[in-house]
């Protein structure tokens, strides 16, 4: 995508921000997206290149800015399927910066029953805004709302309202073990391994090293090297895949005990 088709910017960056001057090129970039990914034609009609999202922030840009589409265009059908998917992900994230804000009305209800306090949160969507681009995504942590929020309209409730508890139930549950790593969560955790270090001085040193680095909180490697680190662990037989999960092997656990 970058070297052959010139469709995206430097692809080994983990920065999520853009320099302010990039905003001046927004119109040209959006036009290029429309030429390359015609499936975004309708969405582009709702994009406003004059909008400036929080992603445009000079202070948050490190050595390289976020990965975005370029002003170049190409024949989408000539791209491999994997290249098509990656370009669409990058283009959609860029396009979302020029959509209106997602707006909702939140109602928080706190009530007392038999000297026990209960709390309920409900969000009523007013305008989908940029989230309309992600309607069909399932399990996307970037756009998921509050886990405990209900999609109900509770705005008619008033302070002091009374009600009757018509039923209740108790569901026995067991504490679940931490979720297995996936490639995404493992890469994310490599940016903040300091939280697992028991040596206080070493932990503080790692955190201090990453001070003022967006997205880094005492990690190992860089965005450009972490994939190689993980690949090396697979090659040495320390990691293996089980379905979508990445787990340690017996060799890795034996080595850890040495």
Question: What do these predicted regions represent?
Answer:
Residues 2-258:
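Core catalytic DNA strand-manipulation module of type IA topoisomerases
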